[in-house]
């Protein structure tokens, strides 16, 4: 962020409490709330100081309280603070693709600065009601289990639940790949308060799977914005807004469909709670900030479809102590249109993507939104899988042969459905050696209807595993019979 030297408004630090700074300005020159301030000077050892902070409170007597976006080590009372006159401004546009940024929009991938000079402030109003696209439409992902049983809404918000090692990263990368190929869209990934190692692993895997093209960055499909666990709470609280601002540019100016990933939305709330306590606000339920609902709403309301394009957001949700009534996840749930739950049991069986077909939900799976055929097919698949789940205890004790003929047939079909819900991914080709498949919704419904109707009862279970469409199943069955 460049600062105009002429007419610069300069204040002085009067108090430092961890990441919170109190700064006094001249009378009549107090900066506005959310203005970015830059602390400049030198440490006693002669090192250059450049710390950016954001105004949070006006204390009176020409004094403001600001939260730092960088570590405050080495700062002293009396240091100069320059008011930039605007909110934090971050780079936007095609030049951001394939790059990694921090909360301030500075690149952290050692590939130099961003070429374009275009920037937008991170604090912006949500789109006006008249600009919103109110039509309910499905966002096709090309992933069978998602499109059939828990479809995503175009411009909606999806919660992604899953522990470590169940395939969250691979699912995210496949979605990024598919939106670029099928919708001509781009993605923005916001790493909010998660492990630095995970951020690095994701970047390396994206380069390996060509989601980021290291040779030609302009062909990359994603921009990455990281504010990881070791960052001050101010950075973790604002990094989601930095990522969202980059996504808004692609939606509003380039008129594209954008996928915005936030990993993890709980850390956004957690950082807000830390900042709230540092600012001296009275804590609310379970120690969270009293402004929890409005902070969450301020972020979520900007994620929407307009008449120009859409931002569809997929948010990993950490549930503290598995307590769904905790104010952080409970506030998040109010904004979600769908949930995608990853199951360790399915991952253990080798069924990937390990999306739980019974636990995952979507408000879009209604007969007046999706087609009647889609709705009936999804309900029949769920009923079959639910009945199979109920019969598993009986099978474990008595064996399959003790079941009634009708139940034996249902179990056989359920096992085929379970395997047909798996699918080879483009981004996993390097690991599996199997070519990835994008399966349209029409093909998905056709394939599951064939299983439910009994037309493919004679085919072996193995033919359905890692098959894309019904034609792939027939081809695999033929190969197995040889």
Swiss-Prot record:
The protein's annotated catalytic reaction(s) are: ATP + H2O + 4 H(+)(in) = ADP + phosphate + 5 H(+)(out)
Cited CDD domains: ATP-synt_F1_beta_C, ATP-synt_F1_beta_N, F1-ATPase_beta_CD
What membrane topology does the UniProt entry give? Answer: Peripheral membrane protein
Asked if the record carries the keyword Plastid, the reply is: yes
Keyword ATP-binding attached: yes
What's one GO-annotated cellular component? Answer: mitochondrion
- Which branch of life, at top level? Eukaryota
Question: According to the UniProt entry, what is the EC number of this protein?
Answer: 7.1.2.2
Question: Which residues take part in binding ATP?
Answer: 162-169
In terms of InterPro entries, this protein maps to: AAA+_ATPase, ATP-synt_VA_C, ATP_synth_F1_bsu, ATPase_a/bsu_AS, ATPase_alpha/beta_chains, ATPase_F1/V1/A1_a/bsu_N, ATPase_F1/V1/A1_a/bsu_N_sf, ATPase_F1/V1/A1_a/bsu_nucl-bd
Entries under SUPFAM superfamilies matching the protein: C-terminal domain of alpha and beta subunits of F1 ATP synthase (SSF47917), N-terminal domain of alpha and beta subunits of F1 ATP synthase (SSF50615), P-loop containing nucleoside triphosphate hydrolases (SSF52540)
An example GO BP is: proton motive force-driven mitochondrial ATP synthesis
* A GO molecular function held by the record: ATP hydrolysis activity
Q: Which UniProt keywords apply?
A: ATP synthesis, ATP-binding, CF(1), Chloroplast, Hydrogen ion transport, Ion transport, Membrane, Nucleotide-binding, Plastid, Thylakoid, Translocase, Transport
According to its UniProt record, where is this protein located?
Plastid, Chloroplast thylakoid membrane
Assembly and binders? F-type ATPases have 2 components, CF(1) - the catalytic core - and CF(0) - the membrane proton channel. CF(1) has five subunits: alpha(3), beta(3), gamma(1), delta(1), epsilon(1). CF(0) has four main subunits: a(1), b(1), b'(1) and c(9-12).
PANTHER family this protein is in? ATP SYNTHASE, ATP SYNTHASE SUBUNIT BETA, MITOCHONDRIAL
Regarding protein family, the annotation reads: Belongs to the ATPase alpha/beta chains family.
Q: What does this protein do?
A: Produces ATP from ADP in the presence of a proton gradient across the membrane. The catalytic sites are hosted primarily by the beta subunits.
The name on file for this protein is ATP synthase subunit beta, chloroplastic
